[in-house]
Amino acid sequence: MLTYETWEENETKGALSVLSWAYKEYKSEIVYACSFGVEGMVLLDLINQVNPSAKVVFLDTNVHFQETYELIQKVRERFPSLNIIEKQPKLTLDEQDKLHGDKLWESNPNLCCKIRKILPLEESLANEKAWISGLRREQSETRKHTKFINQDHRFQSIKVCPLIHWTWKEVWRYVYKHSLPYNSLHDIGYPSIGCEKCTLPVGEGGDSRDGRWAGKVKTECGLHYQ
């Protein structure tokens, strides 16, 4: 039954309760891996309500859009107490080119993601018991069975997904209601934003992730495989 007291929790579809449980359960041994997409803006706001000094890691591949880096600065200003860490890969782009050839994101996108995303996240999670992700069930077939609390065999960790029941419209409704900053690329046809080299705009009516690795069999960077 919807009451005044339960309105906030109804609006967040269980997300606040999940986050409160996660920070109580794992205390300082949990980190939010944020890509700074629109779901990330919602989660940052919710996390800030539960734990204003929470750890947030951004996997800086060095090939993100400039708009993404600009958004991170806006988020730092909006949530100054959050501990935002920009995690770098061990290899610079020049070092990667020398080892694997130019434009690895074209010749071998799986290896590129491993070097610039998966290995850095492994390092970031090495001393953590759990991590938070903005996965939603409606995003894709590979994500439709995601639970609030998941055993992550890939990273030998617990993956907490507070937004699994949120729809795309509900995410944006929350962003607008709370005047949250968001990536300006969303306004010009980019529903899902990753690295600049592997992200294209999506036409009207297209799937929200159609612009990721367009023209390739690849649909995930590898962070969310079990």
Curated annotation (Swiss-Prot):
<keyword id="KW-0479">Metal-binding</keyword>
<comment type="pathway">
    <text>Sulfur metabolism; hydrogen sulfide biosynthesis; sulfite from sulfate.</text>
</comment>
<dbReference type="InterPro" id="IPR004511">
    <property type="entry name" value="PAPS/APS_Rdtase"/>
</dbReference>
<dbReference type="GO" id="GO:0070814">
    <property type="term" value="P:hydrogen sulfide biosynthetic process"/>
</dbReference>
<dbReference type="GO" id="GO:0004604">
    <property type="term" value="F:phosphoadenylyl-sulfate reductase (thioredoxin) activity"/>
</dbReference>
<dbReference type="GO" id="GO:0019379">
    <property type="term" value="P:sulfate assimilation, phosphoadenylyl sulfate reduction by phosphoadenylyl-sulfate reductase (thioredoxin)"/>
</dbReference>
<dbReference type="InterPro" id="IPR014729">
    <property type="entry name" value="Rossmann-like_a/b/a_fold"/>
</dbReference>
<dbReference type="GO" id="GO:0005737">
    <property type="term" value="C:cytoplasm"/>
</dbReference>
<keyword id="KW-0408">Iron</keyword>
<dbReference type="Pfam" id="PF01507">
    <property type="entry name" value="PAPS_reduct"/>
</dbReference>
<dbReference type="InterPro" id="IPR011798">
    <property type="entry name" value="APS_reductase"/>
</dbReference>
<comment type="similarity">
    <text>Belongs to the PAPS reductase family. CysH subfamily.</text>
</comment>
<feature type="binding site">
    <location>
        <position position="112"/>
    </location>
    <ligand>
        <name>[4Fe-4S] cluster</name>
    </ligand>
</feature>
<feature type="binding site">
    <location>
        <position position="198"/>
    </location>
    <ligand>
        <name>[4Fe-4S] cluster</name>
    </ligand>
</feature>
<feature type="binding site">
    <location>
        <position position="113"/>
    </location>
    <ligand>
        <name>[4Fe-4S] cluster</name>
    </ligand>
</feature>
<keyword id="KW-0411">Iron-sulfur</keyword>
<dbReference type="GO" id="GO:0043866">
    <property type="term" value="F:adenylyl-sulfate reductase (thioredoxin) activity"/>
</dbReference>
<feature type="active site" description="Nucleophile; cysteine thiosulfonate intermediate">
    <location>
        <position position="221"/>
    </location>
</feature>
<dbReference type="InterPro" id="IPR002500">
    <property type="entry name" value="PAPS_reduct_dom"/>
</dbReference>
<protein>
    <recommendedName>
        <fullName>Adenosine 5'-phosphosulfate reductase</fullName>
        <ecNumber>1.8.4.10</ecNumber>
    </recommendedName>
</protein>
<dbReference type="GO" id="GO:0051539">
    <property type="term" value="F:4 iron, 4 sulfur cluster binding"/>
</dbReference>
<dbReference type="GO" id="GO:0019344">
    <property type="term" value="P:cysteine biosynthetic process"/>
</dbReference>
<dbReference type="GO" id="GO:0046872">
    <property type="term" value="F:metal ion binding"/>
</dbReference>
<comment type="function">
    <text>Catalyzes the formation of sulfite from adenosine 5'-phosphosulfate (APS) using thioredoxin as an electron donor.</text>
</comment>
<feature type="binding site">
    <location>
        <position position="195"/>
    </location>
    <ligand>
        <name>[4Fe-4S] cluster</name>
    </ligand>
</feature>
<keyword id="KW-0560">Oxidoreductase</keyword>
<keyword id="KW-0963">Cytoplasm</keyword>
